[in-house]
Amino acid sequence: MAKTIYIAGLGLIGASMALGIKRDHPDYEILGYNRSQASRDIALERGMIDRATDDFASFAPLADVIILTLPIKQTIAFIKELANLDLKEGVIISDAGSTKSAIVATAEKCFADKSVRFVGAHPMAGSHKTGAASADVNLFENAYYIFTPSSLTTPDTLEEMRDLLSGLHARFIEIDAEEHDRVTSQISHFPHILASGLMEQTASYAEEHEMARRFAAGGFRDMTRIAESEPGMWTSILLSNRDTIIERIEDFKSRLDEIGQAISKGDENQIWNFFNQAREQRQAMEIHK
């Protein structure tokens, strides 16, 4: 049976998701919300969506599934708005936020007495590119699509979401919202801090050592690629997971101090072990491409 899907947020993630849904469910009607007229026009012209609006509340009552692919603060605000709308009985509401605890807690509170099935989600895919113009049907190919079930999630909710998103060709997995935030603080959020910090440090250093800009090559490029990511999104992510991220920063500072002391003392064995352990751990770790 054909369904009506409402994707709020037609940036890279939302627009790519629309393409993936269309691939396996061409009969589904996809509605799209975005404040930007340009993004709405691109999504319509490329057939990602069937109808578009800049009034979020207008399409919500029509949808069987609502997916919020928005910054975290806006996702939380829209969850609160949805709680006051006359939605379809048994509607599924999900999101694509990079942190989950605050979003899931808000949904559980707002929809506690509603016939809403909410499941948090985080597709672990992305790019330094942004906007509907950069949408790619293969963006989620073989990437982890993490579900963080709530007290409002039923077994059939997850089954329906997996079917809806089958065209993304992602790898679906479930994890507790708080554990999700702990894990992603280390392997996603903190690396962005490192990349941006290294970029800022190098730019400052290059003011007196001009050749630093010219000599930057492969290793520097690889380590700083994600420093091109959208600042607003990452500000929102860090502030929504601040305690866990501060723990990661403090832990890393202590590790930097250790290797700094080893270099200062000329401790060849400790320095060699530092690099060798990292090399072995990197080789043993399953790092998704």
Language-model-detected regions and their locations in the chain:
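Conserved short alpha-helix immediately C-terminal to the canonical SAM/SAH-binding motif I
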Residues: 38-39, 74, 100-103
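Rossmann-like NAD(P)-binding element
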Residues: 57-87, 91-92, 98
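NAD(P)+-binding Rossmann beta1-loop-alpha1 motif at the extreme N-terminus of oxidoreductases
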Residues: 1-61, 65
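Rossmann-like NAD(P)(H) cofactor-binding subdomain of soluble oxidoreductases
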Residues: 80-133
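Residues at the starts of beta-strands that form the adenosine-phosphate
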Residues: 4, 29, 117, 144, ...
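Internal alpha-helical scaffold of NAD(P)-dependent oxidoreductase catalytic cores
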Residues: 139-224
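Interdomain hinge/lid region at the active-site interface
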Residues: 209-278
